[in-house]
A protein has these predicted regions:
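Generic detector of leucine side chains in alpha-helical contexts
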Residues: 20-28, 52, 56, 83, ...
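Histidine-centered nuclease catalytic patch
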Residues: 92, 96-99, 120-150, 160-174
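Mixed-charge, low-complexity interaction segments
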Residues: 1-77
Length: 181
């Protein structure tokens, strides 16, 4: 019986090590701007139920992802020679998006190296969400310095009114849960 228990324990340890390695690698590659604290691994080391332990670790990562401090800061500008004739005129605050909005969104996305400004995940133009440093309702304009590029998860977080609902709706939940073996 003792040998059998040792074999199971070794197999569990290998599976857990693989889970943790995959999780850390995923977060580093897909959300490089989010600094994750993995102390939860040590805190849960005596947990016998491996799936519960993995779930607790994932919950900790999701909470850290949600609570990661993000400041709406003025963004980098685009070189003047790349701007078009009526750029300044269409940058003024207006409740309606300017007719050149698609171009502005693409320029901001390229300026941000095709990445989410908050977490650093690589996104394609169709997945990119935009937010404003200073909201249009508050007098912000459509100039590049006011446009932020975000992924779907960070857009939900930045615009969150109810943290619990937002956390449960993040795509990141499903992705991380898929690492449980």
């Amino acid at each position: 019986e003792k040998i059998f228990k040792t074999k199971i324990k070794t197999k569990d340890n290998e599976a857990f090590s693989s889970f943790l390695k995959d999780l850390k690698l995923y977060m580093l590659q897909h959300h490089p701007k989010i600094d994750i604290d993995y102390r939860i691994v040590e805190k849960t080391k005596n947990e016998e139920d491996m799936e519960l332990r993995q779930t607790l670790i994932i919950e900790s990562i999701i909470k850290q992802f949600f609570n990661f401090p993000y400041q709406n800061e003025t963004q980098a500008s685009i070189p003047r020679e790349k701007l078009w004739i009526n750029y300044e005129e269409k940058s003024k605050s207006n409740p309606k998006y300017p007719s050149d909005w698609v171009l502005r969104k693409e320029f901001a996305w390229k300026r941000d190296n095709r990445c989410c400004n908050r977490c650093g995940s690589t996104i394609n133009i169709n997945e990119a969400y935009t937010n404003f440093v200073k909201e249009i309702n508050d007098g912000g304009g459509y100039n590049f310095e006011n446009i932020m590029t975000l992924c779907i998860n960070c857009n939900k977080i930045v615009n969150s009114k109810n943290p619990n609902i937002t956390i449960s709706s993040l795509d990141l939940n499903d992705k991380l849960i898929s690492f449980i073996k």
